[in-house]
Regions:
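Nucleotide phosphate-binding site architecture
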Residues: 10, 47, 71
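The catalytic Tyr-centered alpha-helix of NAD(P)H-dependent dehydrogenases
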Residues: 12-19, 49, 53-57, 81-85, ...
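Conserved sequence/active-site signature of Rossmann-fold short-chain dehydrogenase/reductase
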Residues: 39, 46-49, 78, 88
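Residue-level recognition of beta-strand->loop/alpha-helix junctions
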Residues: 42-45, 133
Length: 162
């Protein structure tokens, strides 16, 4: 349950995470040979209305729209660090304006239980939710001390933006 800081050992769980890490390593390797300064933002979870159904929130919204009284949801007993899309954009602009050079976590620093996202999205639909949990919950939470030290302040609550 340790928060991941910029120096933490990274062990991606998905193919997507592995490709992000490969890109980061590639850029760091290439930039070592130059005087080009670069900001590598490690963006944790976020959502937006244009995301595909491969992402959690759009997939849940799509399931809730279906004409069933009971929704069976699998594998949601996990904790993730979601940042509001508005704060994500603000953080990127902030880092650009201060010309930040290096690697930095861009996240909320808050743990969100995935079941709570499903419950929030289901509030108006009022469907019965049946959760089928996997055995071991997982935690993925960013340490954002570095971002805060630079002066960035979050303005938006993730749950108010979904």
């Amino acid at each position: 349950k340790k928060n991941l800081n910029e120096k933490s050992l990274i062990r991606p769980m998905s193919k997507y995470g592995k490709t992000k890490l490969l890109c980061e390593k590639y850029f760091k390797h290439k930039l070592k040979k130059t005087k080009i300064k670069c900001c590598i933002g490690r963006v944790f979870s976020f959502t937006h209305s244009s995301q595909s159904l491969d992402f959690l929130v759009p997939a849940l919204k799509n399931k809730i729209k279906k004409k069933t009284k009971t929704l069976e949801l699998n594998n949601l007993n996990h904790y993730r660090d979601f940042i509001s899309i508005f704060d994500l954009c603000r953080a990127i602009i902030f880092l650009s304006k201060i010309k930040f050079n290096g690697t930095i976590n861009i996240a909320s620093g808050k743990s969100i239980y995935l079941k709570n996202i499903a419950k929030k999205l289901n509030k108006s639909a009022k469907k019965k939710l049946k959760f089928n949990d996997n055995k071991v919950p997982t935690y993925l939470l960013a340490d954002i001390k570095k971002l805060k030290r630079l002066g960035f302040k979050h303005k938006y609550n993730f749950f108010n933006t979904i």
